[in-house]
C-alpha cells in the first residue's frame, strides 16, 4: 500500500455522488481523473447486479501500469479485496481482476483496445460496468461494440482533435451538470453540441481539482511542456485541438 491518500476536492465529491449511466472525464493531465474515476468505477462494480465487467486500455501492460498497480490504483485502493490474474486462469483465459465485493465476487476483464483480433475474440455477451482509459485514443469500433454491451460507462481522456469520431458519437452527446457548467472551458462547451443523451454527464477536471498534486510536481509539469504546442493546449490548458 502506498503512503498516498485519496484527497477529494468538492468537485470530485460531487462526481462520486453523481448517479449517471454514462460519464466522460475530460481535462488536463495530472487532474486526478484516473485516480478518482477508478475508485468510483469499483464502487459501481460492487453495486452492479452483473458479475462481468470490463476495464479497457491501449493494452494490458498499460492497464497494469496506469490502472491496476499504480499508486492509488485498484490494488492500492482495494488491497486484499482484489486479485489480479494477468495471464488469466485455467478456467478463464482472459486477463482479469477478481473483486471480492460484499454482494459476491465480480470479474473485471482487462482488455487492450489496440489489438482488434484479441478484443473481438474476448468481447461478447453483456456486462455491468465498462471503464475506457484514454477513450480518445481507442479504436472507435471497440468503443461502439463495448458501449452497447454495458449498463454503466465511464471514460477518461485528455482533450484531442475535435474531428475524432468518438467526440461526435459519444462525448459531445454528454453535458456538464448545471452547477459545474461554469468550470467547463467555453471552447469545450461549444463542442458539446450533439443531441444530448438522457443522463450522460461531461466532467471537466483540471490541476485545481487534484488536491493530491504537490505544487513542485505541477511546476515541473509546466516547465517541461513547451508552450504553444499541441501537447500544451491539450494537456496543460485542457482544450481540444490538433
Positions of PLM-derived features:
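Phosphate/NTP-binding elements of NTP-utilizing enzymes
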Residues: 1-242
Amino acid at each position: 500500500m502506498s503512503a498516498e491518500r485519496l484527497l477529494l476536492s468538492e468537485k470530485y465529491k460531487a462526481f462520486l455522488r453523481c448517479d449517471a449511466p454514462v460519464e466522460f472525464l475530460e481535462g488536463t493531465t495530472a487532474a486526478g481523473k484516473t485516480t478518482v474515476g477508478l475508485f468510483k468505477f469499483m464502487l459501481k462494480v460492487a453495486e452492479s447486479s452483473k458479475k462481468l465487467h470490463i476495464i479497457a486500455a491501449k493494452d494490458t501492460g498499460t492497464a497494469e501500469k496506469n490502472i491496476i498497480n499504480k499508486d492509488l490504483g485498484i490494488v492500492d485502493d482495494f488491497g486484499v479485496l482484489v486479485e489480479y490474474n494477468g495471464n488469466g486462469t485455467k478456467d478463464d483465459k482472459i486477463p482479469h481482476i477478481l473483486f471480492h465485493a460484499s454482494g459476491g465476487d465480480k470479474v473485471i476483464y482487462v482488455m487492450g483496445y489496440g489489438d482488434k483480433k484479441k478484443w473481438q475474440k474476448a468481447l461478447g455477451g453483456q456486462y455491468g460496468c465498462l471503464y475506457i482509459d484514454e477513450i480518445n485514443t481507442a479504436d472507435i469500433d471497440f468503443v461502439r461494440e463495448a458501449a452497447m454491451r454495458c449498463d454503466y460507462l465511464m471514460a477518461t481522456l485528455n482533450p484531442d482533435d475535435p474531428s475524432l469520431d468518438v467526440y461526435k458519437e459519444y462525448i459531445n452527446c454528454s453535458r456538464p451538470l448545471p452547477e459545474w457548467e461554469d468550470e467547463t472551458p467555453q471552447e469545450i462547451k461549444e463542442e458539446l453540441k450533439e443531441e444530448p443523451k438522457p443522463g450522460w454527464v461531461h466532467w471537466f477536471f483540471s490541476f485545481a481539482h487534484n488536491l493530491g498534486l504537490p505544487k513542485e510536481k505541477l511546476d515541473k509539469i509546466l516547465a517541461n511542456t513547451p508552450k504553444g504546442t499541441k501537447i500544451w493546449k491539450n494537456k496543460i490548458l485542457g482544450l481540444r485541438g490538433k
